[in-house]
A protein has these predicted regions:
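Domain-level signal for Mg2+-assisted phosphodiester chemistry and nucleotide/NA-binding surfaces
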Residues: 1-84
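Extended two-metal-dependent nuclease catalytic cores across DNA- and RNA-processing enzymes
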Residues: 27-30, 44, 68-224
Length: 225
């Protein structure tokens, strides 16, 4: 039995922003149609969906700049109604203290990787090994354990503008790829990133802890020993 693990935050925003000029009932109907289409595309026997609730452990980790401090606060008009609909009609779960991304990871790593498919449009989740489905591109793809680690260390280099995580100045995805392309294991990835940060372990640790998505409850990333 394959279970679809759905990051529902982006789903609500995508449907919500496209429905700002409509009535609430139309926005909910669009969400319902999107969910039905998703289930047909994936042909899964089961699904679990997650929404981000209150609190985030990352807020206390961010020292360089506030976590998500630059994020534009504009929200879709019907966001709350859409979230409530997914909870009441589809059984989605609101998680607190973590993000929906973390909840997807915890659920994915609790079972063998061929029993789930992670449904999202967020590159952050590409650090998880296993099957993924980008519902915007309608693309199914597989990420290996090492590919997931490389994606994670790439983000430590580049940072994440959306979440206000500051990377190295002048390093985007292309330069980051060049820095990491010779690496074959996690220690080499870490050493390459540490060298790029001129040995600043604290900055690497801070960015890593902000960017690392949980594989089990209460997990916080630590520097490789």
């Amino acid at each position: 039995v394959i279970t679809a693990l759905i990051d529902a935050d982006s789903l609500c925003y995508a449907v919500g922003f496209s429905s700002n000029d409509t009535e609430e009932s139309i926005a909910i109907a669009r969400l319902e149609a999107t969910m039905t289409e998703l289930c047909m595309e994936l042909d899964c026997q089961d699904y679990k969906g997650f929404l981000t609730g209150r609190g985030n452990f990352r807020d206390s980790i961010a020292v360089t700049v506030p976590y998500k401090g630059q994020r534009i606060t504009e929200k879709p008009v019907h966001l709350q109604s859409l979230r409530c609909h997914l909870v009441t009609s589809w059984g989605f779960k609101v998680v607190e203290g973590i993000e929906a991304d973390d909840a997807v990871g915890i659920a994915a790593y609790a079972v063998p990787e061929d029993e789930t498919i992670m449904v999202h449009i967020d590159k952050d989740l590409n650090q998880f090994r296993g099957w993924h489905y980008n519902y915007r591109k309608k693309e199914k793809y597989y990420v290996s354990e090492f590919e997931g680690l490389r994606s994670f260390y790439t983000q430590i280099l580049t940072g994440d503008r959306i979440d206000n995580i500051v990377g190295l100045k002048g390093i985007g995805p292309v330069k980051a790829k060049r820095i990491l392309e010779e690496c074959t294991n996690e220690n080499e990835l870490y050493q390459a990133v540490l060298k790029a940060y001129e040995g600043d372990q604290q900055r690497v640790l801070e960015n890593g802890q902000l960017l690392w998505l949980q594989r089990e409850a209460n997990q916080v990333w630590q520097l490789p020993s």
